[in-house]
């Protein structure tokens, strides 16, 4: 349960971070 939760949180964080990088890149950073 803990490992599954940790894995889900890490995947969600990586997904949101990648989106933020794309948005900032389009805005010219």
Swiss-Prot record:
The chain crosses the membrane at residues 3-23. Keywords: Electron transport, Membrane, Photosynthesis, Thylakoid, Transmembrane, Transmembrane helix, Transport. GO terms for biological process: cytochrome complex assembly; photosynthesis. GO terms for cellular component: cytochrome b6f complex; plasma membrane-derived thylakoid membrane. GO terms for molecular function: electron transporter, transferring electrons within cytochrome b6/f complex of photosystem II activity. Its main location: membrane. It is found in: Cellular thylakoid membrane. It is a single-pass membrane protein. InterPro entries: Cytochr_b6-f_cplx_su8_sf, Cytochrome_b6-f_cplx_su8. HAMAP family: Cytb6_f_PetN. Belongs to the PetN family. Component of the cytochrome b6-f complex, which mediates electron transfer between photosystem II (PSII) and photosystem I (PSI), cyclic electron flow around PSI, and state transitions. The 4 large subunits of the cytochrome b6-f complex are cytochrome b6, subunit IV (17 kDa polypeptide, PetD), cytochrome f and the Rieske protein, while the 4 small subunits are PetG, PetL, PetM and PetN. The complex functions as a dimer. This is Cytochrome b6-f complex subunit 8. It comes from Crocosphaera subtropica (strain ATCC 51142 / BH68) (Cyanothece sp. (strain ATCC 51142)).
